[in-house]
From Swiss-Prot:
Belongs to the ATPase gamma chain family. The gene is atpG. Keywords: ATP synthesis, Cell inner membrane, Cell membrane, CF(1), Hydrogen ion transport, Ion transport, Membrane, Transport. Its main location: membrane. Produces ATP from ADP in the presence of a proton gradient across the membrane. The gamma chain is believed to be important in regulating ATPase activity and the flow of protons through the CF(0) complex. It is a peripheral membrane protein. It comes from Cereibacter sphaeroides (strain ATCC 17023 / DSM 158 / JCM 6121 / CCUG 31486 / LMG 2827 / NBRC 12203 / NCIMB 8253 / ATH 2.4.1.). The keyword Cell membrane applies. CDD domains: F1-ATPase_gamma (cd12151). This is ATP synthase gamma chain. F-type ATPases have 2 components, CF(1) - the catalytic core - and CF(0) - the membrane proton channel. CF(1) has five subunits: alpha(3), beta(3), gamma(1), delta(1), epsilon(1). CF(0) has three main subunits: a, b and c.
Length: 289
């Protein structure tokens, strides 16, 4: 049974931990608001751009003049997985859920005889994937110095992907991130960015005249579309990370409070038992006299 001193020290230690988790929860809440606003502000632009490109892609179709970013290489042998996670932990299952989805996708592709290459964005995904998929790594993007996520970061990642695609290093590129829905709900998502995939009809491009041509406009828009999708994913990831951290730190703070209550009860019982024992010894000594 722990001594009163040990129990007192444990109570003090848990109280200090609760202060830290509470502070981290408040910081995450402040960051979440900014990250959520940024993610929500980017969605209309991304949706509008996708609608325009969808219409153009529908008109261009699979013609010989279709841009390579739309038509693809004609093969799906080599897949590049871009796994986006956080630089830090203490955010519940945020990082592990994205890694789990990427790992399952990689396993499926390898089973089909495909070649898998992995580009990690963020420290935590790299750490977790290195254990069993490290031999497939081809690069890493360090976000530790990024204070606020901006479009230039996405442009840099997009340029790297486009350069690798032009060099024939892969056929299909898929990004993995968490789509923000609420503080307690972040959805791990896999989204193909190269070659471009469009669903629905989008804008009716026959209502417009394009110069120099629909193919030319689409060829110019597609690289921007890749950067926009990556930027949107980074913003969604940022909001999801802060939401997950806020929720995790709230749970940790609650658990610390429960532990303090249990330890306090144990401390009071032990103290009461010690006092009772001391009184019995005093009474027994007095009776002996």
């Amino acid at each position: 049974m722990p001594s009163l001193k040990d129990l007192k020290n444990r109570i003090g230690s848990v109280k200090n931990t609760r202060k830290i988790t509470k502070a981290m929860q408040m910081v995450a809440a402040a960051k979440l608001r900014r990250a959520q606003e940024a993610a929500e502000a980017a969605r209309p632009f991304a949706e509008r751009m996708t609608a325009v490109m969808t219409g153009l892609a529908g008109s261009v179709g699979s013609s010989e003049s279709a841009p390579r970013l739309l038509a693809g290489t004609g093969s799906d042998k080599v897949h590049l997985l871009v796994v986006m996670t956080a630089e830090r932990g203490l955010c519940g299952g945020f990082n592990s859920s994205i890694v789990r989805l990427a790992r399952a996708h990689a396993a499926k592709l390898l089973t089909q005889g495909k070649t898998v290459k992995i580009l990690t964005v963020g420290k935590k995904g790299r750490e977790q994937l290195r254990r069993d998929l490290g031999q497939h790594f081809i690069g890493h993007v360090d976000l530790s110095e990024v204070k606020r996520m901006g479009y230039p970061v996405a442009q840099g990642i997009a340029r790297d992907l486009l350069d690798r695609f032009d060099k024939g290093e892969f056929d299909v590129a898929t990004i993995f991130f968490a789509r923000f829905q609420s503080v307690i709900n972040q959805v791990p998502t896999a989204q193909q960015v190269i070659p471009a995939v469009f669903e629905g009809e989008g804008e009716v491009s026959s209502l417009y005249d394009y110069e120099p041509s629909e193919e030319g406009v689409l060829a110019d828009l597609l690289p921007r579309g890749v950067a926009t999708q990556i930027f949107t994913a980074l913003l969604e990831n940022g909001a999801s990370e802060q939401g997950a951290r806020m929720s995790a730190m709230d749970n940790a703070t609650r658990n610390a409070g429960d532990m303090i209550n249990r330890l306090t009860i144990e401390y009071n019982r032990s103290r009461q038992a010690a006092i009772t024992k001391e009184l019995i010894e005093i009474i027994s000594g007095a009776e002996a006299l």
